[in-house]
Amino acid sequence: MSAHDVRLFGDAIAASRLEDRFAKVKASSLLRLAIEDLYPGRIALVSSFGADSVVLLHMVAQVDPTTPVVFVDTGQHFDETLRYRDELVARLGLTNLVMAEPDRETVAEEDPEKFLFASDPDRCCDIRKVQPLARALGGYDAWITGRKSFQTATRSRVPLFEAEGDRVKVNPLVGWSATDLIDYIRAAGLPPHPLVAKGFPSIGCLPCTSRVAPGEDPRAGRWRGRTKSECGIHTEPLNVGQDI
């Protein structure tokens, strides 16, 4: 079965067939396949420009620097992340940065003081991250994520290809270890996120991200003290108007 034999409409059968066919393909080759062969003009990389985002950004830039790179500007990012984003876009020659932003009226109504994260973090993530991304991905058949199986228990069984409603998520780094990421960044001479050296192995919005102690789960600093471990973009199919 070749890539062209599969009808890529995001159904579970298509994702399963792709998984079986390309499970042994290395990450860089998988990205080239997805961008140039499987979903030409219909795929985007979603990047947080976080702790190890530079790996996928570098790989995508080598395949096609015009590939859409979607960044969700929640309005709550660290300043370091925003500067790092601009640095990487320029350095890697990425030419299609897509900004996904929260609906201003919704934010003004539900979070005018920017403290919704403290009382209802799920709703805060929904209006600031989930819904903006759902709108931004409306015209794509597939999107690329940077999830890795070592990050949390909820990500330990993430496949390479994952059905999401009428789209497919491609997870090329799912089998990578933390050492693999570090080695790639060093070998390619890429700049690390400035907060990594300060104890932030996983970086999200400023109010809900804290330092991680040695030996802790890499995402232990996200929503610390709560049972929440995901923002919502990977827990349900992305649909505008969904209630997480």
Residues of each region from the PLM?
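Nucleotide-activated chemistry modules centered on ATP-dependent adenylation/adenylyltransferase
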Residues: 2-244
